Amino acid sequence: MPRPTPPSAPGQKPRASRRASPVADTRGGLRLVVAGSRHITGLVEALHGQIQRFAPPLRGGDAKGQSARADDSDGLPASRGLTGLVYRGIQGSLRLVGDGLDGLLAPFDSALQAGARSPRRDALVAALNGVLGDHLLRSGNPLAIPLQLRQHGQPLDLASLGAGLADRGVPRRVLLLVHGLCMSDFGWQRKGHDHGEWLGRELGLAPIYAYYNSGRHVSDNGRALADVLEQLVADWPVPLDEIVILGHSMGGLVARSALVQAAEAGHGWPQKVKQLVFLGTPHHGAPLERAGNWLHRVMDLSPYVAPFTRLSRLRSEGITDLRHGNLLASDWQGGSRFHHADRRTPVPLPAGVACYAIASTAGAPGSPGSLLGDGLVPVDSALGHHKRRALDLGIPPSHQWLGHGIHHLDLLSDPAVYRRLLSWLSPH
């Protein structure tokens, strides 16, 4: 049977899944270098212009309004006259050099056989996608990750799966693992452990890993995952009885978004989801993104520092979704993603699904570090607690677990976390 094809982004042509190509990687890297050089040139131009105008050290009240009107503008006018001509010439030269190098390499991209994936390469590309994934997608950069399902580090091939398991029988229960920000499917392999492989062997589940561009909006990835899972259920070699979902960090938000959007689209796969587990998921946001937004606002007060807010705007759509834990497009549409309060639509957990949440503190109980949760996600956010009743997820205490001395990434390998997962997911 055919492998599920990842859906294309809105306004984008469908992209075929392919293995890593060294030429594609080089082209993508060159595009990033050129784009970065152009952004730095623009930053220098803006700072130069402010110095030329002898602007007052603090900006007036209208500056905030200017910044709020556009995500990619700092409200500073472009240089004019000879100065502007020089900077435009530099920008044009950088663009021509970049386009020329890209054009020279393009014919070799398809001609050279794609190389095998490696954890090191994937870690770098996944990190780039987490920070700049929205830019990579909009600019057509080959480093942008198309959402796909994977197994054993390769795109899921259901035909091979059916043939390889013909003598043992194809599992009728699937464990879907959804990674977090700046991670890949290889990220589940940590310190000699993989929750997916271990739970799969113990419980007779087929572990399948989502691999996606974590720099895109959570709602975009949720919609794409919903469509891919509908195709997975249709193409699975035998009728599927059950889907169990395990989401780490942002992955839990993507899973929730996929379930909501799948229900709205009339998909059938949500009816097969019986259990949903969250590992350190920031259901109500993460303080580091809020700190980044606070720094952005402070920098915007001075016209001499304001050009540097362009650097803070490098935060991807996915990262800014983590400020409050956005799930739906309506949570971020209609305003600047860098200047908005929590205006999420309350999204309850799916009915008929047993939901579990694991949180942790990086320090010992009662230590100052315990106030920060696992180092990235506060305990209340990970457990779904909220002072507003409509936003509180209402996960039963018996379905919550709080560990201590466990960092955010160590949730992927800690023995106590695994034992808790095994206990919850084992048949009773």
Map each language-model feature to its residues.
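Flexible, membrane-associating and regulatory peripheral segments of lipid-active enzymes
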Residues: P2-Y209, P415-R419, S423-H428
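Helical cap/lid subdomain of alpha/beta-hydrolase-fold lipid enzymes
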Residues: P119, V125, V260-H428
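Glycine-rich His-Gly loop
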Residues: V178-M183, H248, T281, S360
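Short coil/turn segments at secondary-structure boundaries
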Residues: W188-K191, D220-R223, L259-V260, R290-A291
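Alpha/beta-hydrolase active-site loop
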Residues: R216-D235
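Residue in the alpha/beta-hydrolase core beta-strand immediately N-terminal to the catalytic nucleophile
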Residues: E242-V244, S257, Q275-V277
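Gly/Ala-rich beta-loop-alpha elbow adjacent to hydrolase catalytic centers
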Residues: L246-A255
